[in-house]
Amino acid sequence: MKRYIILFAVLILGTVKANAQTKLKLYGGKNHDQFLGCIDCSTEDLNSIWCNFGEYGSVHKVNSIWNELGKYGSDKSDYSPFNKKAKYPPPVLDQKGKSHGFMTINKSNPKRSWDSFVNQITEQRDEIVKDIPAYHDRVFHDFHN
């Protein structure tokens, strides 16, 4: 019996750990073929939307959702999660390619992501861009504690 309890505990912990390590990624463009960054990666990961020095976490880079003048960050672009009327908001995919819905500020979009953190990003963008890494650290600290 003790052996079964240990096996059960190992299975549960393994499942929790695997779920915690799921990497959610954004893809943009009409065909969703442009990588836009990792949503739940660290601020040190150059592929993270939270890394100021990377391609996807800078307010100045072309493929960053934080670039308010860019194709993927403008509130006027059909490819931006911050445009309520966007025709092609970026899908959120996990590392296995499973869809987690679309990152969009449009709460009426039936395909909007069901992930509360993804939706929080679209709703708190103005606060986030003031200090992207600090926002990440605050939110992920709360999430992990």
Language-model-detected regions and their locations in the chain:
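Repetitive, compositionally biased segments used for assembly/scaffolding
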Residues: 20-145
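Beta-strand-rich domain onsets/edges
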Residues: 16-18
